[in-house]
């Protein structure tokens, strides 16, 4: 059996790396798209500022074809360096693009012109500029910078240009952080990071882009794989620079820390919380298969080299192997541990189809029960004796770490998975109320099967009465026999009230007059109604009042 287990591990490792060995038999390249890239011919900051204004218009205009908008974005990413043309030639090795690079300069009037001469390029330049400035809305060219006067500002100094190009570069690279992985929540995180650079005096609010411009640039970055590959190549090249980095390179290296391993949070968090915590529960047989998968993925990640942290951004097909669904049990356990330990896990969406609720709760329970435990290997390495270990346990309990921490309890409660028990029998609300009270609302609520029993139609199904959360509705009260008798004896008006005749009304007036004057009422008063043929005999004590009550 030991040999079989070894062969299974080798086979899984072979499957993980299958197809990555060997060379190409034939070069598979699709039809390339031609893009126009404008680069400055000199280091003049006035030329570069005018070119930046032109390129931002080209990126902002959604009506332009990709050959112009993608080329303008490539130029905008490279213009922050001293030699933009060399950067594009050396780092843009995309098999899907064919770059047509054109150098630009300033003419005698201070306007941009193509450095190369010829009637064809002159006509091409006029058509290029005309397309860029052709906006569906004439006011769109003022919506790039938050300062509307910045678009018409031409007399820029060298110091202002350095502040401007640094701010623009930071904003463009920040857009890459969540352009692919989380575009819906990208705006808030981008604002937080930009505020950080404002506080560090690396960026300046005077050159801040508008929200609509950043949304359009983010959308172009997400749509164009060539743009993302070019940005990843720049980040990898900046890493190789070591400590000899310029201001722009340092800003790119700083932003790249947020971009690395984007889309690989499931794999990284599994290593951190599932394995890095070293809980003894990893010895369960159920975890052994997932642990073997993790071993092979670690080897695969290392074999990919420096491109591995960016595999999701460049859409490498290997990224599918790192999906948490391939090691769902271990990932579910790691998410339970992470939500119980780390406050930052509150913003992580773990509601996935492959989440195993039982192993998720196992991770939370392990954290609760292991709040005072110590890793033996680490304790031996640090030379911790039993006295020090007891001191550590008391300190942990006094600090409220683990289940004693109210924040931890609130975090774990946020991720509770509800269990609903289905029962086909009817529900007795009175009995259920007693169970809820005596067991402190821990009894599961039983509801009947909506489909009904066999042979019973859905129309005959009567749903139970609704229950409020945390308490049970009181049972319906039925009237007692005494209350029913009182209700039956209560006088009810007749369906057809009887009308009094004129003579009866006169007799009633006389009767009230005698009462008011204190004269004794006659013993008998004859009242004749309109719906009776015989007079009604009534005494003057109370029967006549009942008759009055019957009249409208």
Swiss-Prot record:
Q: List compositional bias (Acidic residues) regions by residue number.
A: 423-435
Q: Which UniProt keywords apply?
A: Capsid protein, Helical capsid protein, Host cytoplasm, Ribonucleoprotein, RNA-binding, Viral nucleoprotein, Virion
Which segments carry the region annotation Ntail? 403-552
Task: Give the CC-aspect GO terms.
Answer: helical viral capsid; host cell cytoplasm; ribonucleoprotein complex; viral nucleocapsid
Basic and acidic residues biased stretches? 436-449, 474-491
Q: Which InterPro entries match?
A: Paramyx_ncap
Ranges for the region named Ncore are 1-402
Q: Hydrolase: present as a keyword of the record?
A: no
Q: Which Pfam families match?
A: Paramyxo_ncap
Please tell me where RNA binds in this chain.
178, 193, 258, 352
Which GO terms label this protein's molecular function in UniProt?
A: RNA binding; structural molecule activity
User: Where in or outside the cell is it found?
Assistant: Virion; Host cytoplasm
Top-rank lineage group of the source organism: Viruses
Polar residues bias (residue ranges): 527-552
Annotated region (Disordered) at 423-552
Q: Does the record carry Membrane as a key word?
A: no
Q: Which family does it belong to?
A: Belongs to the paramyxoviruses nucleocapsid family.
What does the entry's free-text domain comment contain? Ncore is globular and carries the regions required for self-assembly and RNA-binding. Ntail is an intrinsically disordered monomeric domain in the C-terminus.
Q: How does it assemble?
A: Homomultimer; forms the nucleocapsid. Binds to the viral genomic RNA. N0 interacts with the phosphoprotein (via N-terminus); this interaction allows P to chaperon N0 to avoid N polymerization before encapsidation. Interacts as N-RNA template with the phosphoprotein (via C-terminus); this interaction positions the polymerase on the template.
Functionally, this protein is described as follows: Forms the helical nucleocapsid (NC), protecting the genome from nucleases. The encapsidated genomic RNA serves as template for transcription and replication; encapsidation by N is coupled to RNA synthesis. Forms the encapsidation complex with the phosphoprotein protein P. Before encapsidation, the newly synthesized free N protein, so-called N0, is chaperoned by P.
Q: What is this protein called?
A: Nucleoprotein
- Gene this protein is translated from: N
